[in-house]
Swiss-Prot record:
GO cellular component: plasma membrane
GO molecular function, one term: antiporter activity
SUPFAM superfamilies to which the protein is assigned, alphabetical: Multidrug resistance efflux transporter EmrE
Compartment(s): Cell membrane
Protein name (database record): Quaternary ammonium compound-resistance protein QacH
Entries under NCBIfam families matching the protein: qac_SMR_H (NF000279), QacCGHJ (NF000384)
Keywords of the record: Cell membrane, Membrane, Plasmid, Transmembrane, Transmembrane helix, Transport
Topological relation to the membrane, as annotated: Multi-pass membrane protein
Lineage start: Bacteria, Bacillati, Bacillota, Bacilli, Bacillales
Length: 107
C-alpha cells in the first residue's frame, strides 16, 4: 500500500506542477485552484507514504520520479525543448531511484 500512496503523491505533484505553469502566476482561477488541490493531495499521500517507508527512499523516489514525469509533461504538453544532457540526466535519476529502492534502507 505505501507504494500506491507514493504513486498517488507523485501523480498529484505532476498535475499540480502542470497547472502551476498554466495558472500564469496564479492569475487564472481554475488552474490556481487545481494547483492548490493537487498539492494538498500530493502532500497528504506523501505523508501517508512516510508512515510506512523510510524518509530517504520516500523523498528520493518522490522527487526523482516527479521530476522525470514533470519533464515528460513539459515536453509533451507545453512543447518545451529537451537536450541530450537532460535525457541522460533523467536516465541517471531513474537508475538512482531504482537502485535506492532495491538496495537502500531496509523496508
Amino acid at each position: 500500500m505505501p507504494y500506491l500512496y507514493l504513486l498517488l503523491s507523485i501523480v498529484s505533484e505532476v498535475i499540480g506542477s502542470a497547472f502551476l505553469k498554466s495558472s500564469d502566476g496564479f492569475s487564472k482561477l481554475y488552474p490556481t485552484i487545481t494547483t492548490i488541490i493537487s498539492f494538498l493531495i500530493c502532500f497528504y499521500f506523501l505523508s501517508k507514504t512516510m508512515q510506512h517507508l523510510p524518509l530517504n527512499i520516500t523523498y528520493a523516489s518522490w522527487a526523482g520520479l516527479g521530476l522525470v514525469l514533470t519533464t515528460i509533461v513539459s515536453v509533451l504538453i507545453f512543447k518545451e525543448q529537451i537536450n541530450l544532457i537532460s535525457i541522460i540526466s533523467i536516465i541517471l535519476i531513474i537508475f538512482g531511484v531504482v537502485l535506492l529502492n532495491t538496495f537502500g534502507s531496509s523496508h
